[in-house]
A protein has these predicted regions:
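Contiguous, well-ordered beta-strand patches that form the walls/edges
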Residues: 73-168, 196
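Edge beta-strand at a domain terminus
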Residues: 155-159, 164-198
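Bacterial Sec-dependent N-terminal signal peptides
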Residues: 2-3, 16-44, 195-198
């Protein structure tokens, strides 16, 4: 009887230990499904500015909310870099490559010079899995750029993943500055971005 009790005790401990290992490995397993490359499919730009619903970024006379098509319509096209997710145990980082229109102040001209220059910046978004098994990211608040004249980059902030699955990652950029040729002014807006697995 005593031996039977000991066997039951050992089996209980083994089962508990196995359960603990399963919980620990599950978070790592969830993240491992995201490993690989992603590309931007769509960038939906919106603003709270009154009477502005679209933006004419490429100066063709037609406004759009599709920021990706506006960027691709610029004369100096930029290489769209693929984003990549890498994992280390139960944490991972999505190295998110975001195209940003960079504007420069011109000392000889009052205000800004709407020189079209598109930079691709790397945003490291750190991913974890919460207790409900949902993938979350930290809020990336602000890029620290030493060049005070780079207006577009200075105003890029509040970036986070709002929804994630292994085949699609949705990212929101809280502040994304654009120069609208229709109104001839800088407009602060937000962008929802769809990343698709390559």
């Amino acid at each position: 009887m005593k031996n039977k009790s000991l066997i039951c005790l050992f089996l209980s401990i083994a089962a508990f230990s196995s359960c603990e290992q399963k919980i620990t490995s599950t978070k790592a397993d969830v993240l491992s499904e995201y490993k690989g490359d992603y590309e931007i499919v769509f960038m939906d730009w919106t603003t709270t500015e009154k009477n502005i619903n679209t933006v004419d970024l490429d100066n063709n006379g037609c406004g759009s909310n599709d920021l990706m098509s506006e960027l691709l319509g610029l004369p100096n096209r930029f290489p769209v870099s693929k984003s990549r997710f890498v994992q280390k145990n139960e944490r991972g980082t999505l190295f998110f490559y975001l195209p940003v229109v960079d504007y420069f102040t011109d000392p000889g001209i009052k205000g800004i010079s709407p020189t079209i220059s598109v930079a691709t910046v790397e945003i490291p978004l750190h991913l974890t899995v919460n207790e409900q098994g949902v993938v979350e990211s930290d809020l990336f608040t602000q890029l620290d750029w030493p060049d005070e004249n780079r207006i577009g980059l200075k105003n890029l902030s509040d970036i986070k993943i709002i929804k994630a699955s292994p085949d699609r990652i949705d990212i929101e950029v809280g502040h994304y500055l654009v120069y609208d040729y229709a109104t001839q002014k800088l407009i602060d807006g937000s962008v929802k971005i769809w990343l698709s697995r390559m």
